[in-house]
A protein has these predicted regions:
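An exposed, glycine/acidic-rich loop-and-rim segment of catalytic or binding clefts
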Residues: 1-289, 293, 298
Length: 298
């Protein structure tokens, strides 16, 4: 196991951005930045032993300072949408910025992935990033201290852990917004890649992709990934939730009941790469990019 640090560039306001490269004994590599605690690269050996970078990112700091698709980003304090850009915490309403129609998306516009995080090498295979989010930041109550760590194991696991401490009731709903294509950077589609999800239900959204409150069974619908099949097999089905989202962009109700367990799998027969996802979160968002070239599981 090894970690090396490289200079990646400089932000518009003159701050140095560093790239932390974690590498295991099998050649697998992950690169993370102190700008946004972003996962910038993930190189995985394919069936022939050739390394493929399976996450999308930018070649320079300027790309990450804008980062419209949130590539590799740590999103918080809240990931995804808040209807009407108003959240109720401990009986009090807090008004957020409307940055997605009438709603708030990813706690923007001042998002965590545009900020510089403090970084330490916590072990020979672990980098830890920390950020202080003051009371009122993004419209949320409470001073919050947030830690995100990346650990790369010799078993081929990239472990992402989130920790938050606040001095008031607040929301803490972070995610990593990486997009994956297991065929690597030269591929322009994920439609032939296969997905399995351990979920019996999902939460339909309205036209603004805000959950309606319904928990709907996936049985007999194109949302059912309990039996592995390709992303493209049903993505164009005549089904209202798919039409509203322009493909898959839905919250699945996992069967893990809040315990750490395998919840999903993405497979490429072409590259021979298989990615398994485990979590203790009760829900998982599955999202195909607008060009159907990438797949996110958060």
């Amino acid at each position: 196991m090894s970690i090396r640090v490289e200079e990646f560039g400089t932000t518009k306001d003159g701050q140095k951005v560093k790239k932390y490269i974690l590498e295991n004994g099998k050649g697998m590599k992950a690169a993370v930045l102190n700008l946004g605690a972003v996962l910038a690269e993930l190189h995985v050996p394919d069936k022939d032993g050739t390394l493929r970078d399976v996450v999308w990112g930018y070649e320079d700091v300027a790309g990450y300072e804008v980062n419209g698709p949130d590539l590799g980003a740590v999103v918080g304090r809240n990931a995804n949408r808040i209807g009407g850009a108003v959240i109720t915490i401990a009986g009090k309403d807090y008004t957020l910025v409307k940055n997605n129609g009438e709603n708030n998306l990813h706690s923007g516009p001042d998002m965590y992935f545009t900020r510089m995080w403090k970084a330490i090498i916590a072990d020979d295979n672990k980098v830890e990033f920390s950020l202080h989010s003051p009371d009122g930041d993004q419209g949320y109550p409470g001073n919050a201290d947030i830690t995100v760590s990346y650990t790369l194991t010799d078993g081929g696991e990239l472990q992402i852990a989130y920790e938050g401490k606040a001095d008031r009731d607040t929301i803490f709903n972070l995610t990593n917004h990486s997009y994956f294509n297991l065929d690597g950077q030269e591929s322009d589609s994920v439609l032939e890649q296969k997905v399995w999800l351990d979920a019996d239900a999902f939460t339909p959204g309205d036209a603004g992709l805000i959950p309606t409150g319904e928990i709907r069974s996936v049985e007999g619908t194109p949302m059912d990934f309990r039996t592995e099949h390709t992303i493209g097999e049903r993505i164009d089905a005549d089904y209202e939730p798919l039409k509203l989202a322009g493909g898959y962009d839905h919250n699945y109700v996992l069967k893990n009941e809040g315990t750490y367990a395998l919840c999903g799998r993405l497979i490429s027969d072409k590259s021979g790469i298989c990615m398994e996802v485990s979590t203790d979160a009760p829900r998982s968002e599955e999202h195909t990019s607008e060009l159907q070239s990438l797949f996110a599981i958060s």
